[in-house]
Amino acid sequence: MYCPFCRHPDSRVVDSRVTDDGTAIRRRRSCPECGRRFTTVETAALSVIKRSGVIEPFSRAKVIAGVRKACQGRPVSEDALALLAQRVEDELRATGCSEVTSQEVGLAVLGPLRELDDVAYLRFASVYRGFESLEDFEAEIALQRAERALERSETVERGRPVPSRGVDDR
């Protein structure tokens, strides 16, 4: 790493820390030539390949803006939107790929958004999946109801004690 003061081609790492949100590493460095200290912030690049083929850096702000439109008029806080965007970025980075498609970004948004707000999920899914008719909405609502019923039944089953096989239960 070049020293920004004397342009010496080497530096020594004095301290390394992960930033608060965990997306970058902050390093304190020292130049062996001039002795001055400086800080660098290192992040792994995450790029999004859009449908048009254009590649641009991943932007949490864009995720938040898109989800905010779906949440308009809904009781969803800015903190919840920021947390959702963080979860989306974490999921995309966990793939280990430096480039993801806009389709993958949309898919990564759907899960956390469904947990956050059903109506916002339906709004986002309608744009993301290109709903063209009432039947598309009805099919998605039916799917959500079926999944919700399945989740409830699994919760009830886990909550009930398993009957013992005693002498009288044969």
UniProtKB/Swiss-Prot annotation:
Binds 1 zinc ion. It comes from the Bacteria. A zinc finger (unnamed) spans 3-34. Residues 46-136 form the ATP-cone domain. InterPro entries: ATP-cone_dom, NrdR-like_N, RNR_NrdR-like. GO terms for biological process: negative regulation of DNA-templated transcription. Its cofactor is Zn(2+). One of its GO terms (molecular function) is ATP binding. Pfam families: ATP-cone (PF03477), Zn_ribbon_NrdR (PF22811). Keywords: ATP-binding, DNA-binding, Metal-binding, Nucleotide-binding, Repressor, Transcription, Transcription regulation, Zinc, Zinc-finger. Residues 151-170 are annotated as: Disordered. NCBIfam families: transcriptional regulator NrdR. Negatively regulates transcription of bacterial ribonucleotide reductase nrd genes and operons by binding to NrdR-boxes. Belongs to the NrdR family. This is Transcriptional repressor NrdR. It comes from Acidothermus cellulolyticus (strain ATCC 43068 / DSM 8971 / 11B).
